[in-house]
Structure formats: structure tokens, C-alpha cells
Amino acid sequence: MSALRSYAAVSLLAAAVLPLGGSAEAGPVRNDRPLGAYDQQVVERVRARAAARLDDPACSRVLTDFKDRGGRTLESNLQPLGVSPSRYLLELSFVDGTRLPVCRNETVMMAVTPGVPRVFVCPQGVGRLNSRLSRVEFRSGSLAEAMVIHEMLHTLGLGENPPSTLEITERVRERCR
């Protein structure tokens, strides 16, 4: 197995879905810390490329592949907002996840509470600059894009386990080539 493939397999374990009522649940914006300038640039680059992928109908069908706990497709959860999947992703809030306990787990890249339109980006670690997402983008831009789309699906109500993190990311990668 190549080093990149091994890294990709490990990185697929990189998202955390916080339980409803968890520390990332919707709350006052004042608790959210903005990303540093470099990480904000990383998010903007990755998000723009991921949004371009979502403009392809084959990719945006991933919103019909999964359902929320109530049995609704993620596409049906997006429809009341009156925006395309790519526009939704471009408007989604990405914030600093440094204070989240789940980000202490070095395999977690980002964290979301299902149905809450906010993504927490985990740092590389204590005393290290930049986010884990920046490391993934450096090694595999397409994997970083799939991970951002994966997190977007959670913000539209997708839970996890089932489906597993690996199943979600692999489906995104299949649909959004």
C-alpha cells in the first residue's frame, strides 16, 4: 500500500460527530473562535474546490444517498434554504475547534453536531501551528475536499455509525471524482 493510500485510510477516521447536546451544539456565536489567517485560507481553497465538485450533478447526488435520523434525505433538508449544495457549502461556518475535547484526539480533523451549520476545525496539536485539515490538503487536496463535503453532510443532519466515517467519505469520493 502506498504512503498516500495509507495516509488516506487513516485520515478517513478524521471526522467526529458530536452528540446532540454536545459541546459544539448551536449556541451563542461569541463562543466561536475564528480560524487563524492561514487556516482560513486553507478552508477557503478547499471549500471552493469542493463546491465546484458539488456543481456536478453526479456529485450533488450524494445528498440523496444518506438520510437523517428522521428518514429525510439531506437534499430535502437543504431545499427549504433555497440554495444549491455548492452555495450552502460556501456559506457554511468553519471555526476554530481548539477548545473542543474531541479535538484532543489526533485522528479527528473536524467536528460537527448533526444539523448544526457550523464545522469546528481541529488544530494539529499543542504548540503546533495550523490545522490538521491543512496537513491533509498538503498531502491530498482531493481527500481534503471529500472531507469538507463529508462534514457538510453532517451539518444537514447526517449522523454517524451508521454509516461509518469511512463509508461516508468513500461515498463522497465515489460521487465527487
Report each predicted region and the residues it spans.
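Walker B catalytic acidic pair
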Residues: E151
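Bacterial N-terminal signal peptides
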Residues: V10-P19
